């Protein structure tokens, strides 16, 4: 039986250099290869013309370059594109490209499904299957970059920002998310600014501390309720890591981070007559007063079977004005791609194994999988 080949898209620069050292090669050769992968999108060793033939042959014998394939895509009337990405075993995740006048953001998934079961989120209602590998995470960017033309002009704006806000809770997959983000930030990788890579979390506090020790990226935090009683219902992980613990973890992260410029983004989905009253706005403002942040109000995007409705514009406006009276910067997120179910909270994918009992068992046994090993 032949030895399984190493997928080079699984390796950040440190791991890539270690592989090349094992082959008796100098570190700069690893850097050259990464540029071919991430600057030019080359997947054929024979096209890497500044790498000598002997090394190309060694690489072909020992390594491979395999990214998950785009199985289908839908384009919204607003230019948003939702991609179904085939990650094997009959499973798909969803990746969303969001173009704007001055940027283009790619919303990337970190897991097949999600174990957190947030009650307003379509993905959370589908159950959890597995973590994505490094190559499956960076492969989403790699494939969409190919779709957009990499160095060629296809009329689509190239990716300038990446947000880890797709399917899954990124902090439950640190072992793969951290090296994937390293590749996003690396000058020999996708070469993105740390302020242009954002990780969103619902509050796995021990993993948030580990993230802050390992890498510096922009942070978005899913709060969605002004008190523990309501958040226990909307975001069940709150029962394990309540708001006071989460906010303390956020402040620790801010203290370590340059990418956040001293404050994080608070995400707050607007659910009609659930969490959107002016009293709750006052409560949220008092909750967040010691945590430097701007607030992103997200109109709820309904999905089939959802028990919630979207807050009216007038309720969102009143809620926003209360927060601004306390001095918060408030942004009401423009809904993008809702006509193709690509908006926030609508990603579900094709998850064949939706056994929630398995997810809950893993959460109990692994303390929600916060180790990086």
Curated annotation (Swiss-Prot):
Cofactor binding comment, as recorded: Binds 1 [4Fe-4S] cluster. The cluster is coordinated with 3 cysteines and an exchangeable S-adenosyl-L-methionine.
Predominant subcellular localization, coarse grouping: cytoplasm
Q: Which cysteines are joined by disulfide bonds?
A: 107-344
Q: Which reactions is this enzyme annotated as catalysing? A: adenosine(2503) in 23S rRNA + 2 reduced [2Fe-2S]-[ferredoxin] + 2 S-adenosyl-L-methionine = 2-methyladenosine(2503) in 23S rRNA + 5'-deoxyadenosine + L-methionine + 2 oxidized [2Fe-2S]-[ferredoxin] + S-adenosyl-L-homocysteine; adenosine(37) in tRNA + 2 reduced [2Fe-2S]-[ferredoxin] + 2 S-adenosyl-L-methionine = 2-methyladenosine(37) in tRNA + 5'-deoxyadenosine + L-methionine + 2 oxidized [2Fe-2S]-[ferredoxin] + S-adenosyl-L-homocysteine
Annotated residues that bind [4Fe-4S] cluster are located at 114, 118, 121
Print the keywords alphabetically.
Answer: 4Fe-4S, Cytoplasm, Disulfide bond, Iron, Iron-sulfur, Metal-binding, Methyltransferase, rRNA processing, S-adenosyl-L-methionine, Transferase, tRNA processing
Q: Kindly indicate whether the keyword Nucleus belongs to this entry.
A: no
Q: Which residues cross the membrane?
A: none
Q: Which cofactor does it need?
A: [4Fe-4S] cluster
Q: Where is the Radical SAM core domain?
A: 100-339
**GO cellular component, as recorded:** cytoplasm
Query: Per its database record, what is this protein's job?
Result: Specifically methylates position 2 of adenine 2503 in 23S rRNA and position 2 of adenine 37 in tRNAs. m2A2503 modification seems to play a crucial role in the proofreading step occurring at the peptidyl transferase center and thus would serve to optimize ribosomal fidelity.
According to its UniProt record, which protein family does this protein belong to? Belongs to the radical SAM superfamily. RlmN family.
Protein name per UniProt: Dual-specificity RNA methyltransferase RlmN
Name the lineage: Bacteria, Pseudomonadati, Pseudomonadota, Gammaproteobacteria, Alteromonadales
């Amino acid at each position: 039986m032949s030895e399984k080949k190493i997928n080079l898209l699984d390796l950040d620069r440190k791991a890539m250099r270690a592989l090349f050292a094992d082959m008796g090669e100098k570190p700069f050769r690893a850097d050259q290869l990464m540029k071919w992968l991430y600057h030019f999108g080359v997947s054929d060793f024979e096209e890497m013309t500044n790498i000598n033939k002997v090394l190309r042959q060694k690489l072909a014998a020992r390594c491979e370059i395999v990214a998950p394939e785009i199985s289908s895509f839908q384009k919204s009337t607003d230019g948003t594109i939702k991609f179904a990405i085939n990650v094997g075993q009959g499973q798909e995740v969803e990746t969303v490209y969001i173009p704007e006048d001055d940027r283009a953001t790619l919303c990337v998934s970190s897991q097949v499904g999600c174990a957190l079961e947030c009650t307003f989120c379509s993905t959370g209602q589908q159950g959890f299957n597995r973590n994505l590998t490094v190559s499956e995470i960076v492969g989403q960017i790699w494939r969409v970059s190919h779709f957009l033309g990499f160095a060629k002009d296809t009329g689509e704006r190239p990716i300038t920002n990446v947000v880890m806000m797709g399917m899954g809770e990124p902090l439950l997959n640190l072992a793969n998310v951290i090296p994937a983000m390293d590749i996003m930030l690396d000058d020999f990788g996708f070469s993105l600014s740390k302020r242009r890579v954002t990780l969103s979390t619902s509050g796995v506090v021990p993993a948030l501390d580990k993230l802050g020790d390992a890498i510096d990226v922009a942070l978005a935090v899913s709060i969605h309720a002004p008190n523990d009683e309501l958040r226990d219902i909307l975001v069940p992980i709150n029962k394990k890591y309540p708001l006071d613990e989460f906010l303390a973890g956020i402040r620790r992260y801010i203290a370590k981070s340059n990418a956040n410029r001293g404050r994080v983004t608070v995400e707050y989905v607007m659910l009609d007559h659930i969490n959107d009253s002016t009293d709750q706005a006052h409560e949220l403002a008092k909750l967040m007063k010691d945590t430097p942040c701007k607030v992103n109000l997200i109109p709820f995007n309904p999905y089939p079977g959802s028990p919630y409705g979207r807050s009216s514009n007038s309720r969102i406006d009143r809620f926003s004005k209360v927060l601004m009276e306390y001095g918060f910067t408030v942004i009401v997120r423009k809904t993008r791609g809702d006509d193709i179910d690509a908006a926030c909270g609508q990603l579900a994918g094709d998850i064949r194994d939706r056994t929630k009992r398995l997810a809950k068992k893993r959460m109990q046994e692994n303390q929600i999988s916060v180790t990086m090993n």
